Amino acid sequence: MINKIYGKIVDKKESSIIILAFPFEFEILVSSFCKMELRLLEDVEILTYFHFRDDDVKLFGFLNISEREVFEDLIGVDGIGPKAALKILSGIKYDAFRLAIAKEDINLISKVKGIGNKIAGKIFLKLRGKLVKGDESSSYMLKFKELEQSIVNMGFDRKLVVVAFREIMLSDKFLILKEAEQEQFLFTETLKRLSV
């Protein structure tokens, strides 16, 4: 199995990237969120999932272990193959997906293009016990702990800040942002809500 590839991104296609790991070039299928985080000619480390069947050999790539784990959990659901799992992770970020499972928000999952209520229900039933090891929303919120403290230091109640964070993080606007843009958006939207 190919676990990880180090190399330079030499091309970005609609649903994949090309990495030069001298002397080889690898085409790696990635989610739209993963692709947005990567830049041409950037040296990267991509975690991979090697998919091999008699008539199909593909490499799927991920920025971190958590994204790959969610992908592997998804392909463990009956009727969801690697391409469908990647499509799901292109419609909802892996951390937001985990949060939706933890919060039993089937509607958020069913909003992903090509995923209806039936498949969303199947995913939820299969993964709710597997992905929810404690409070996933808490681990998701750790990314923004400093921001939370900054807003509390401005005189706002911590409980209200946490409630606002959770609501904003599940919004469509937040979920389509690049990771680098999420903190600023979360800060601005939280202040708008709390200042009313």
From Swiss-Prot:
InterPro entries: DNA_helicase_Holl-junc_RuvA_I, Hlx-hairpin-Hlx_DNA-bd_motif, NA-bd_OB-fold, RuvA, RuvA_2-like
Span list, region Domain II: 64-142
Keyword Cytoplasm: yes
Alphabetical UniProt keywords: Cytoplasm, DNA damage, DNA recombination, DNA repair, DNA-binding
Compartment annotation: Cytoplasm
Subunit structure, interactors included: Homotetramer. Forms an RuvA(8)-RuvB(12)-Holliday junction (HJ) complex. HJ DNA is sandwiched between 2 RuvA tetramers; dsDNA enters through RuvA and exits via RuvB. An RuvB hexamer assembles on each DNA strand where it exits the tetramer. Each RuvB hexamer is contacted by two RuvA subunits (via domain III) on 2 adjacent RuvB subunits; this complex drives branch migration. In the full resolvosome a probable DNA-RuvA(4)-RuvB(12)-RuvC(2) complex forms which resolves the HJ.
Protein name as catalogued: Holliday junction branch migration complex subunit RuvA
Highest classification ranks of the organism: Bacteria, Pseudomonadati, Spirochaetota, Spirochaetia, Spirochaetales
